[in-house]
Amino acid sequence: SREGMEISRKTSPIYQNWLDINLEHINEAAESIKEKDMGKLGKVTEENCKFMHEVMETSIPSIVYMTGITNSCLDIVKDLKARGHELFYTIDAGPQVKIICNSNSSQIIKDEILSKTKIKEIIHTKVGGPPSLINEN
């Protein structure tokens, strides 16, 4: 992914636009966390994720991480949002979708993805505790 981002930095015509908007996205995300506004956090997270993938796709050579299954997962997220579930996604340099949701939606998300895609396993995690120092070196 470092190599891919270096290719994007050098060749994508929209790389600088993505950098320019990143500080705005970071500030919006920080504000939404302070406000405990999951919808607002989801909107900016998804927007930044999509922009990053557009940067990679417009690189030479084009870098495409998303697969058909990735897109199927995004369709499921959209459908669940339309049905009133509070969730959003992000995807880093790879095809794996990370879905952030309230705990009351996690099982239906898992059920929908497993029944509608070829995904065999979902890793379910929870928010950890506060930051702590584990090694001073």
What function would you assign to each model-found segment?
Residues 1-137:
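C-terminal nucleotide
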